[in-house]
């Protein structure tokens, strides 16, 4: 099939798929290179242009959440530093200084259209701890009800490397899951995802539409892939993470005229990463496996370990010999083999640590007696909410 015809077919599929979305809530993520004109300070002209597009969506009743990088780069400029600092304390200080300018600029750009904006700085702990996750979700929901536009960024001033999201692509995907977004738009300095590096290969073709879980995307964008690193790998990973909540992702150049409104209207610009029900389960398991902080541990006997690892079964309370830590229902915990001490899986637990202790080593028919009548929970960790780590 000729490349031109193939591209036309892909564009038609893109438009058809995009127009099937009922888009009421959108996450827009803008990276540092775009926001700061490749590190030369905040590009206010570009920011005001994106604000104009966001205002058009806002006027149509579409709720927009913005994930904005650029605090460290702006801090470097404001402090007249010759280069980006390497020491953690200096980087955190730059983030503190630059965040002021970042939020100030977004506020000024949006208020001219009558849009109130707010600042929300998050850490990995805020989203890995269930109670803080729910509190954050509640605050975001209230802001949206008030028609306030949240501007979200990682709290680089207090975050250490070991518990960083690593990039705002990931943070945007997690925000999409928090608020059940209908679309996640990642604005970048590339037109989309290509089959090869277009700078080196004139025959490289942009991928207009693909499943977020398609393995070959990692081959293209991975560390050893054709495109090298270049940031595209994290964007594809973020697309997979957004797929966990059923949210499609568009990766597209932020330099395209009216790019945000054109994407939301269903125009074929950039690369659309789609999802389906099976992809949600696969992406969810990957998200669980990537969790940095565990809220507690479930120590399991050999029989339960075999059921989980070899037969991909749910973890039943009868196989749990010990509960460690203080956690709530819905928190992510590790599952550890009692004989080897090895972590075999991580998963989202259906019981608080208090109730887990009460039902550990007990059979299902005893739950009503232990926890009260009409107890519906029968598994400690469901297999769909469990990811193997060995």
UniProtKB/Swiss-Prot annotation:
Gene3D superfamilies: Acetylglutamate kinase-like, PUA domain. CDD domains: AAK_G5K_ProB (cd04242), PUA_G5K (cd21157). Pfam families: AA_kinase (PF00696), PUA (PF01472). Disulfide bonds: none annotated. Its main location: cytoplasm. Keywords: Amino-acid biosynthesis, ATP-binding, Cytoplasm, Kinase, Nucleotide-binding, Proline biosynthesis, Transferase. GO terms for molecular function: ATP binding; glutamate 5-kinase activity; RNA binding. Pathway: Amino-acid biosynthesis; L-proline biosynthesis; L-glutamate 5-semialdehyde from L-glutamate: step 1/2. Transmembrane segments: none annotated. Substrate binds at residues 69, 156, 168. It is found in: Cytoplasm. It comes from the Bacteria. It catalyses: L-glutamate + ATP = L-glutamyl 5-phosphate + ADP. GO terms for biological process: L-proline biosynthetic process. ATP binds at residues 29, 188-189. GO terms for cellular component: cytosol. Its EC number is 2.7.2.11. Residues 295-374 form the PUA domain. PANTHER family: GLUTAMATE 5-KINASE, ISOPENTENYL PHOSPHATE KINASE. Catalyzes the transfer of a phosphate group to glutamate to form L-glutamate 5-phosphate. Belongs to the glutamate 5-kinase family. NCBIfam families: proB (TIGR01027). This is Glutamate 5-kinase. It comes from Psychrobacter cryohalolentis (strain ATCC BAA-1226 / DSM 17306 / VKM B-2378 / K5).
């Amino acid at each position: 099939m000729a490349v031109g015809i193939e591209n036309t077919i892909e564009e038609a599929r893109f438009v058809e798929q995009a127009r099937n979305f009922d888009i009421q809530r959108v996450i827009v993520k803008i990276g540092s290179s775009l926001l700061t004109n490749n590190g030369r300070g905040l590009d206010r002209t570009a920011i005001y242009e994106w604000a104009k597009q966001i205002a058009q969506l806002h006027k149509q009743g579409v709720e927009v959440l913005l994930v904005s990088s650029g605090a460290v780069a702006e801090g470097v400029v404001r402090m007249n530093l010759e280069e980006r600092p390497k020491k953690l304390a200096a980087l955190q200080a730059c983030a503190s200084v630059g965040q002021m300018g970042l939020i100030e600029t977004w506020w000024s750009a949006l208020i001219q259209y009558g849009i109130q904006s707010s600042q929300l700085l998050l850490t990995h702990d805020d989203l890995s701890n269930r109670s803080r996750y729910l509190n954050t979700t509640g605050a975001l929901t209230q802001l949206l009800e008030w028609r306030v536009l949240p501007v979200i960024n990682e709290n680089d001033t207090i975050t250490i490397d070991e518990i960083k999201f690593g990039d705002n692509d990931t943070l945007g995907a997690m925000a999409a899951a928090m608020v059940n977004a209908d679309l996640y738009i990642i604005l970048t300095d590339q037109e989309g995802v290509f089959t090869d590096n277009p700078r080196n290969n004139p025959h490289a073709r942009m991928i207009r539409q693909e499943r977020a879980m398609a393995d070959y995307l990692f081959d293209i964008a991975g560390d050893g892939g054709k495109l090298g690193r270049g940031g595209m790998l994290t964007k594809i990973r973020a697309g997979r993470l957004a797929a966990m909540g059923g949210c499609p992702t568009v990766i597209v150049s932020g330099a395209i005229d009216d790019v945000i409104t054109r994407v939301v209207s269903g125009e074929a610009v950039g690369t659309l990463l789609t999802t389906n029900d099976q992809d949600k389960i696969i992406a969810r398991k990957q998200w669980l496996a990537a969790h940095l902080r565990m809220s507690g541990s479930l120590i399991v006997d050999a029989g339960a370990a075999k059921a989980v690892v070899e037969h991909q079964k749910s973890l039943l309370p009868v196989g749990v010999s010990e509960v460690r830590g203080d956690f709530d229902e819905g928190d992510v915990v590790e599952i550890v083999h009692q004989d080897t001490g090895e972590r075999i899986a991580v998963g989202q637990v259906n019981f608080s640590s208090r109730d887990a202790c009460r039902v550990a080593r007990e059979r299902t028919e005893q739950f009503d007696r232990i926890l009260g009548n009409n107890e519906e929970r029968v598994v400690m960790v469901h297999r769909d909410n469990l990811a193997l780590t060995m």
